[in-house]
Structure formats: C-alpha cells, structure tokens
A protein has these predicted regions:
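Nucleotide-activated donor-binding/catalytic signature segment of Leloir-type glycosyltransferases, i.e.
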Residues: 1-23
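Short glycine/serine-rich donor-binding loops of glycosyltransferases
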Residues: 49-52, 70
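Short alpha-helical donor nucleotide-sugar binding micro-motif in glycosyltransferases
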Residues: 31-36
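A short, well-ordered alpha-helix in the C-terminal region of glycosyltransferases
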Residues: 112, 119, 126-142
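C-terminal alpha-helical cap of glycosyltransferases
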Residues: 145-175
Length: 175
C-alpha cells in the first residue's frame, strides 16, 4: 500500500496522526476499539475484513464499502439493515495477471465516506447506543466462536456426504 507517513506529511496532518511500528497486544487493541466512535475501511477488494469484525465485536459501528466480505459485515443479511454505513461502489475496475486471471476492485468515493462520517457523528447519544447494541448482537450471533464452529462442522459434514454420494471410481487405462 501507500507510504502512510508520506501521505500524512503531504496532507499536513503528521502531528495529529500516530503510527505504530510495533505489534499491539490484544488488551490494548480492545481499548482502542472500545474508545473508537466508528471503524472505517476503504478496502477495494476485501475477502473478509478482520479489523472491521474486531471492531464490531466491541459494539463499534463500521463504515465500509459493499465489497467482498465487508458487505456481509456492514449489511445485516437477515433484514438488510446496516451495522453502520454501507458505502455504495462508485467505480469498479477489472484487474488481471498470470497468477490471478481476473479480480474486481470496488471503490467507494471519498465524498461518500465523508458523508458517512458526518452521518455517524450526527447521531444522538440514544441512536449511537441503539446502533452499538445492534452491531454487538449481530457480530456475536453471526461471527462468534460457537457459530463459526457450528458452520465449519456443518460444512465438513456436507463435504463428506457429498463426496460419498458422488464418488465415482475411475479406471485408468494405458494407451
């Protein structure tokens, strides 16, 4: 990715931004997530957003583009409500190489992200508390440890059953 230190200097915000060059332990990360008003991800090709999920596990709403695994986090598939602000995709590119033939990159606009931040900070204390409770419930029921274990187990059972039902013996003949 880009050199964030250089970016902060170019923007003139280097005195208000802190970068860590060391690994931050879980207890400190938990504190940071808990004191955050929201978590923003501007990823354009996210398989699954771990930082956004960690944030949600503390009840912190997220702002994220509707791309990849972030869509499942920011949009509650049960009722299509949002766990923060879901950013629409404003530009889509198709990238390819020898190792990865084709992959879409979905970009949300900076203007939409700015509006989302304004929306989050415009919520009343009661609205923030209600959203935080919703985010926390969704994160724990959909992505909590027991649910993950259950889904993993069910997937393995399905794979084994499908393999047994669809197994065909192949005879290889020499030509």
């Amino acid at each position: 990715g880009p050199n964030l230190i250089a970016v902060s200097e170019n923007l003139g915000i280097q005195d208000t931004v802190i970068f860590s060059r060391e690994r931050i332990d879980f207890a400190k990360m938990n504190i940071l997530y808990n004191i955050s008003d929201c978590c923003i991800s501007m990823s354009y090709a996210e398989g699954f957003g771990l930082s956004t999920l960690e944030s949600m596990m503390t009840g912190t709403p997220i702002i994220a583009p509707k791309t990849g695994g972030l869509t499942r986090q920011v949009v509650d598939h049960r009722d299509e409500s949002h766990n923060g602000v879901a950013l629409d995709i404003s530009m889509k590119t198709l990238v390819g190489s020898q190792s990865v033939p084709y992959i879409y990159e979905d970009y949300a606009s900076c203007e939409d992200a700015s509006e989302a931040l304004y929306k989050m900070y415009s919520l009343s204390a009661k609205e923030k508390e209600k959203l935080s409770e919703k985010v926390l419930e969704y994160a724990h029921t959909q992505f909590g440890m027991q649910n993950t274990i259950d889904k993993w187990h069910d997937s393995m059972i399905d794979i084994i059953k499908n393999w047994k039902n669809n197994y065909q013996r192949l005879d290889v003949q020499e030509i």
